[in-house]
Amino acid sequence: MGISYQSPIWFNMTDELQQYIITKKNSGTDTIEPNIVNLYDYKMSTNSMYSVGLAYIFGNKGLISFQYDHANYQKNSFDIGNGDVNFMNQNKKIQSTLKSAGTLKFGGEYRINRLNLRAGYINQQTINRTSKDLNKGFSFGLGYDFGGSILNLALSKMEIQRSESMYQEGLVDPIKINIDQIQFLVSCSIKL
C-alpha cells in the first residue's frame, strides 16, 4: 500500500517582449525598431496531487495493482504581487473553468514460467467543469525472458472524447471529437 502527495510547484517567471516592424515595398524596405524591451515578472503555481495505491503480490506468479490520483486544477494560479487585473481575471477564469479530477488505474501481471502476461486499464476524469470529456483506455502485453535478454510486446488503446466550441459567439454549439489512439510497443532488455 502506498500514499503519496505531490506538492504544488511554484515558478518565478520573467517574460521578455521586444517588437519591431519591417515593411517591404517596391522602393525598398522600411524598418521601425524602437529597441524597447519590456520585462514582466510574475509567479505561477500549479496544483498539488494526492495518490493512493494498493498492490497484491501472489508469490512469484504475479501481481494486481490499483492506483487513484486526485488533483484540484482550480488551484493553478498566477500572481504579480500587486493585484494585477489581468492575472486576477485569469485566475477567476481558471477557477470557473477547471475542477478537481481523478484518474483510476488498474493493472496486473501473471507469470507462466518465462512468459509474463500483462493487462491494464485507465480512466481519467475531465478537468474542464463544463464538458463531459472522456479519457479511458486499456493495455495488453507480454514479455518473454530468454535468460540473457527479455523481449516485451505491448498494445495500448486510448479512447478520447471531447467537445470543443469553435467560436465564442454565434455558432457556439460544440463539436464532438472522438480520438482512438492505438500504440504498439516493442522493447528488448539485455541483462549484464
Q: Where are these predicted regions, by residue range?
A:
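Outer-membrane beta-barrel porins/channels
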Residues: 1-192
